[in-house]
Amino acid sequence: GIHPYIDRIINEVHKLTEKGFIHDEHIKAEKYQYMDELVTTINEYNDILALWIKMKQGSLSLNIETFGLNELFDLIRKGSRAFEMKQQQLEVTPTDTYVKADKALTLFMINTLAENARKYTPKGGKVKVYANPTEEYVEISVEDTGYGLSEEDVTRIVGEKLYNSQEIGILDAADREELLKNKGSGFGLMNCKGIIEKYRKTNEVFRVCLFNVESTLGKGSRFYFRLPKSE
């Protein structure tokens, strides 16, 4: 839920006021940036729920356009503070590829996968965001050096329309308490799959659309999706 993010904002405000950081312009700027990212995360969480409701009601509409992926990658790069707080490295590889899709939903999907990677990757880990173009489609990947998933969990995430996210990874977790603390609703990934399904039902151009996961326990995961390539 959003409560941990609200608690973090309160904690940052406390540091600014009670610890005297308000007088240090450099620290103050860093704190403001971090709080801004936390507020953005809360808004994104609300967007996830709203999107889920729309998909369940069958009222989700697609605004298809041609756009450059690098514009979205730049936005992802600006959210690096949350990764730095966990001593993680966020690596976003620039790309000159263009896709035909809904821009807002594409950003939502990349954001969702990057946030999941951040949550389930330990301190000192790396999260990579990159795009690989082919003749027909562009494959957008979010790869991490996190805890990884079992084959059974990957099958559930990819194959089941609705699953209990609290059960994913729990049997293989070295620290179950830490894993459960990071758990969300699971709606983010379900929304990503739902968006891809919506594309595939739209017209023949989107037959290349796909959502998939590759993972190795103890080594990390790669979540990826495909969108039609455009010139």
List the predicted regions and their residue ranges.
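Short conserved segments within the C-terminal catalytic ATPase subdomain
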Residues: A82-V92
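Short alpha-helical segment of the dimerization/phosphotransfer core of two-component systems
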Residues: Y34-Y45
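Short beta-strand/loop element within the Bergerat-fold HATPase_c
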Residues: G124-E136
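Conserved micro-motifs of the catalytic ATP-binding
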Residues: Q57-L62, P94, Y98-A101
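Acidic ATP/Mg2+-coordinating residue in the GHKL
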Residues: D144
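Short helix N-cap motif at coil->helix boundaries in the Bergerat
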Residues: L69, G148-G159
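Glycine-rich ATP-binding loops of the HATPase_c
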Residues: R176-L179, E197-E214
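Short helix-loop "hinge" at the ATP-lid/N-box region of the Bergerat-fold HATPase_c
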Residues: A117-R118
